[in-house]
Amino acid sequence: MVNTKNCQSVFPVTRATGPERFLLRKFASKSTTHANATLPFLPASRQISLVLCVLVFICWLLPGLSGHEPWKPDEAYTFGLIRHIAQTSDWVVPTLAGEPFMEKPPLYFVVASFFLRLFSPLLGEPDAARMATGFFIVIACYAIALSARELFGKGAGRWAVLILFACIGFPVRAHQMITDTALFAGGAIGIYGFILGIRHHVLGGAILGIGAAVMFLSKGLLGPGILGLTALTLPLMNTAFRSRRYIVFCAIAFLVFCPLVVPWLYALWMRSEKLFSTWLLVNNFGRFDGTAKLGPKAKHFFYFKLLPWYAFPALPMAAWWLWRSWKTGISASAMVLVTFFLAGFVTLSSASDARELYAMPLLLPLVILAAGACQQKTLWTIKLRPWALGLFCLLPTVMWGAGIILMTGWPAPLWNKWVAQGAPGFTPQISSVMFAAALLATLLLSGLVFLNRTCRESPLSIFTSCITLCWVLAMTLGMPYLDYTKRYSDVFLPLRAWLPKDECVASRHLGEPQRALLEYYDGLITLREEKHRGAYRCNWLLVQHDKRHPEEFVDGTLVWQGERPADNEENYQLYRLNR
């Protein structure tokens, strides 16, 4: 049974102890003691220092944000949308290679275009735009830390962020140029608004409204739908949320949300009612009735199968804490997190398409709840420590071995079996900067694990350091190989010499990532046969062929063809048509 002893005191206004302190005089009317926000989460002897946490954060965040071209598939088309806004300042209609792209609202693209303009003199355009991802991840981590502090006390936020870094499925997507990072940040802000609202309903409602707006302007109705379903379900889950104060809290959130999203909606409607309808009906509701076809068709129990590894170790830690806390009663703050997870899980599972990156928001409540498991030092903590140390010694050693093979080509048998066959044409590359960064991270994180008492005694700290070090090694020693296998520059840059001047080029079956990068590398915007009637007046045709199917007949002369290294699916052919 859920403990509702203190239900009558939910959503009181109390003394601010976090970043909301500056708004205290404006919003507070009365205050009571809020123990969790002021009491320490752990004894000083078991608490990881803020400096060490920041060092791990830097080691985890920076590698992967720069040093490579836009990768297929998500980064490629996202970069095309960002460049359009940077060049035209048109934030109303996201445009990809000359065509409106109404799948997502423009928040991430606008922010990334700002970073592109700001940093492109120092960084390449893709790297400069990718800084937006780092920006949103920093915001998300800060909001997660504040939520954990509200729930468990001072210092809990550090452990929640460390748990997030340890989640196996998170690092890759958290460093990519994708709108889901902005959605993730909005979800973290929204959750903090819910939890803060329990003791400060006005400011909490305002923060919830901001989080919902960020989610809406990142990926449409999906994010606010999860927050809205959470808000509607909470009164059913806990009597603490059946009060006038909670109604005021929700009303404030709605009043803050509307002015932030209406300007873009109104501008889009005024620009084109047809585009507005496409965005609303196809790219939002179409996710659930199957008409959008925005991703792979959802398989049965997709997220049931995904989360055990994707959210490890947050999922088992959160489940363990909930099981231990159920007998004594789960607080209203914890019930917010449980409800958000259930609402998100049901919403995502009911969609017609599914991808692992869609599960990113589900990590938010799990990592915050999992922080509670760090409070209790049990027999399992002692038993898991040797296993964590073993992983820390084993996995980075394997990564270093793989990195040496990629840098030197030695030993030859392993190179020929694993590298030469998987990426034909790739040559060993040694970067002194990347090698130095990998070595420095290895020494730093190894010293953290073996020399710092708090980290040495915590299996979670050891495992997080292990995942972080493996990520650093992959993004330094393995970056040349990964970039070689995922970029399109090796295909489209040679194509430039064969393209006609001052003549239109039609295209067939050309995907969104390919269209975006053709414009970036070659300055070419094709006329798609599937979209433009004028394409049939062009004398040139660029075909994207799926090698798993027979080639289509083209009445013309093959002028050029190319493909990405070791790509078993895509092949590109340029024809001069017989017209």
Task: Please provide the spans of the model-predicted regions.
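Membrane-integral, polyisoprenol-dependent glycosyltransferases
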Residues: 3, 11, 23-384, 568-571
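Membrane-embedded architecture of ER/inner-membrane glycosylation machinery
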Residues: 204-206, 210, 324-579
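N-terminal start and proteolytic maturation junction detector
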Residues: 13-15
